[in-house]
Structure formats: structure tokens, C-alpha cells
UniProtKB/Swiss-Prot annotation:
SUPFAM superfamilies: ACT-like, Ribbon-helix-helix. Transcriptional repressor of the nikABCDE operon. Is active in the presence of excessive concentrations of intracellular nickel. CDD domains: RHH_NikR_HicB-like (cd22231). This is Nickel-responsive regulator. Changing R3A: Loss of DNA-binding. Ni(2+) binds at H76, H87, H89, C95. Transmembrane segments: none annotated. It comes from Escherichia coli (strain K12). Belongs to the transcriptional regulatory CopG/NikR family.
Length: 133
């Protein structure tokens, strides 16, 4: 492990310290390492051809005109990416779905965009993790 010195603005250092405390880091180095890993993983998952895993979560209105069938159709068109799907009834009108995906990150992003763009889908979020060799 290498020791490095960095210079931060006072406001940025204050934000780092606050983040470190909220997340329970023992020191700034641990926080900075995690932030850097997260940034590198995000960049890696945005490159077409990168293999990885992802979690797609979204809320949708199940009574919205043909929305459930459109989502299922989209899932079937991308069946090769799907590892598992969890379906939760939030209330009478809304459902939460969480899909675990695996494959080319470009294809995963395309699938997520197709689902999230459907009218009636809300709170769509894709969390990607590059596959580590």
C-alpha cells in the first residue's frame, strides 16, 4: 500500500469528514478508497463490452394500461441478462420489482433504459458492478 498526500478545499474536507462519520469509516483513507473504487466501478460499467452484474429496481402502477405485460415482454426479450426478479406488492396500486442482471454492461444499460422509460414506471435505478476477475 502506498501513502499519498492530497490537498482538499476546507468545504470538501468537511464534507468528507461528515460522510465518513455517517457511514462509520474509521478514517479518511478508508472513505477515500471506497469513493475511488465506486468511481472506477461506475466508469468501468459504462464501457460497452464490460461484463458485470447489476441490480435494477423500479416501482410501477400494475393497473396502468398494459404496463405489466410490456415490462414482462421487455424482460423476455432480454432473458439472457436476467438472473432473478423479485416482485413486491407495495399497496393496492403499486409494485416494486428488483431484477438481478448479469452480462454486457451496455446491454444491461439498454434493458434498464427500456424498462425505466415505460410510462407508469417510477423511481427506476440501476446499480452496476463490474465483474472482477
Amino acid at each position: 500500500m502506498q501513502r499519498v498526500t492530497i490537498t482538499l478545499d476546507d468545504d470538501l474536507l468537511e464534507t468528507l469528514d461528515s460522510l465518513s462519520q455517517r457511514r462509520g469509516y474509521n478514517n479518511r483513507s478508508e472513505a477515500i478508497r471506497d469513493i475511488l473504487r465506486s468511481a472506477l466501478a461506475q466508469e468501468a460499467t459504462q464501457q460497452h463490452g464490460t461484463q458485470g452484474f447489476a441490480v435494477l429496481s423500479y416501482v410501477y402502477e400494475h393497473e396502468k394500461r398494459d404496463l405489466a405485460s410490456r415490462i414482462v415482454s421487455t424482460q423476455h426479450h432480454h432473458h439472457d441478462l436476467s438472473v432473478a426478479t423479485l416482485h413486491v406488492h407495495i399497496n393496492h396500486d403499486d409494485c416494486l420489482e428488483i431484477a438481478v442482471l448479469k452480462g454486457d454492461m451496455g446491454d444491461v444499460q439498454h434493458f434498464a433504459d427500456d424498462v425505466i422509460a415505460q410510462r407508469g414506471v417510477r423511481h427506476g435505478h440501476l446499480q452496476c458492478l463490474p465483474k472482477e476477475d
